């Protein structure tokens, strides 16, 4: 049996005999799913095509981290945990601690759309609950895990720089 996958203008036939779908996908380290949450199957479409970087824009709304590009598109059921973190954890458990079996670290670009400090404080607490899959930054030590979170958008630069332990890196800019 073969599955056709549309990737950047070409169709690739992937054999599925004797392998799970996740094992049959070749990780594409140069592929990024921008505004990934706009897909019918956020995260899953990107992973099924082998993407190693996905973007989720988040808004802090009533204490929840909701995924949407604009505030008026926020839906209470579209939490960061449900759309991204839980499925990533499931994949990592199924693939021996990686999103793709024996594959590279996957980047989750998290674009903070609401206030930097409040949104990051909420995100930091959530990421800590998923410490088993997220790369850990402790002083000068980096412990790579299945996923590296990369904070963009409204970035709490000083707050993150002053943390002893965190589970996210910072999207750098020229003034940094």
Regions found by a protein language model. Give the residues of each.
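Bacterial N-terminal signal peptides
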Residues: 4-15
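Catalytic cores of phosphodiester-bond hydrolases, prominently lipid phosphodiesterases
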Residues: 22-28, 34-37, 42-55, 59-176
């Amino acid at each position: 049996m073969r599955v056709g996958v549309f990737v950047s203008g070409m169709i690739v036939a992937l054999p599925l005999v004797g392998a799970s779908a996740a094992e049959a996908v070749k990780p594409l380290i140069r592929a990024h799913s921008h505004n990934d949450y706009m897909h019918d199957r956020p995260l899953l479409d990107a992973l099924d095509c082998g993407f190693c970087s996905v973007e989720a824009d988040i808004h802090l709304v009533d204490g929840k981290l909701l995924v949407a590009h604009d505030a008026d598109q926020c839906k209470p059921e579209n939490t960061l945990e449900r759309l991204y973190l839980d499925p990533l954890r499931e994949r990592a458990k199924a693939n021996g601690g990686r999103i793709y079996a024996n594959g590279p670290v996957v980047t989750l670009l998290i674009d903070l759309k609401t206030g930097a400090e409040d949104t990051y404080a909420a995100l930091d607490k959530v990421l800590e609950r998923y410490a088993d899959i997220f790369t850990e930054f402790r002083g000068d030590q980096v412990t790579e895990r299945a996923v590296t979170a990369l904070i963009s958008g409204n970035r709490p630069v000083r707050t993150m720089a002053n943390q002893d332990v965190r589970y996210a890196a910072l999207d750098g800019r020229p003034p940094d």
